[in-house]
């Protein structure tokens, strides 16, 4: 799930309101939902970036990508 700028703005708005005057029960639930969606999006983006990394030994020029990562890349069609 990708998070939109509007959702990030709403997260920030709820955080400011919580500090200033507190949140209703519905707003607390909305805040928790939006925060979880934001964290899930960040984790998915990070995982996607890590899964595309290829590690090369500087001295030998050999591919030293960990086997576990190579397997994930094969599964996703990024390796032979």
Curated annotation (Swiss-Prot):
Signal peptide (residue range): none
Predominant location category: cytoplasm
Superkingdom field: Bacteria
Disulfide bonds: none
UniProt keyword list: Cytoplasm
Keyword Cytoplasm: yes
Cell location: Cytoplasm
GO cellular component: cytoplasm
A UniProt-annotated Pfam family: DUF896
InterPro entries: DUF896 (IPR009242)
Family: Belongs to the UPF0291 family.
HAMAP family listed in its UniProt record: UPF0291
Protein name: UPF0291 protein LACR_1198
Species name: Lactococcus lactis subsp. cremoris (strain SK11)
Origin organism lineage: Bacteria, Bacillati, Bacillota, Bacilli, Lactobacillales
């Amino acid at each position: 799930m990708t998070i939109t700028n509007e959702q990030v703005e709403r997260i920030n708005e709820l955080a400011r309101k919580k500090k200033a005057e507190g949140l209703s029960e519905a707003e607390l639930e909305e805040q928790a939902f939006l925060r979880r969606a934001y964290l899930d999006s960040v984790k998915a983006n990070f995982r996607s970036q890590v899964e595309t990394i290829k590690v090369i030994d500087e001295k030998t020029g050999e591919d030293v990508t960990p086997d576990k990562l190579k397997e994930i890349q094969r599964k996703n069609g990024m390796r032979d």
